[in-house]
Amino acid sequence: MTGAMVEIAAVPTNSVESSTARTTLLPFGHDAMGWTRSGGGSLGFGVGAAIGAKIAVGRERPVVLHLGDGALTYSAAGFWTMARYNTAILTVISNNETYQVVRTNWAREVPDSKMVHTGKYPGLYLDAPATDYAALARSQGVEGETVKTLKELEPALRRGLERTTRENKPYVIDVKVAREGVGADSTWYQDWKL
């Protein structure tokens, strides 16, 4: 995006693996922005942190939440809170359909493991079925959309900021991104039926 569209008050982030995407795709007013990020594997804190940031800065200053799909699975019920209390937060989800940070760290820390050698990472692939996070948000009263190409991203961000700044409503953008690193091409999951 070219230049800052609005002065963002805070960008809580709960996506360890997407820091490059965050700084590349959300380059608004860095000097005025407060960044908060998790540490120590605290997946799921992002939605609550964004709601707290919005309460702190008030209606006049925008808050953008950036998180990965894995982190969102721990806290998606927060969309209901955003809708109920008109908490105008723009939520941008980097959706790679995996717990990428867990897979990447496992491959780095235990490179000779059976998981790395077979490409089978139990419980880390989040597709089959895929979650439509924009639809999940809508089911709780928050409008949103899914972005599949880089060309679609800037217009989606503009719509999201319009919704949050002018209409004072929350908005979700589910951005499909590629998996990266060791095991990125693995779509294996243990299939069993009752």
Regions found by a protein language model. Give the residues of each.
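Thiamine diphosphate
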Residues: 21, 25-194
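Active-site pocket-lining segments that scaffold enzyme catalytic pockets across diverse folds
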Residues: 1-17
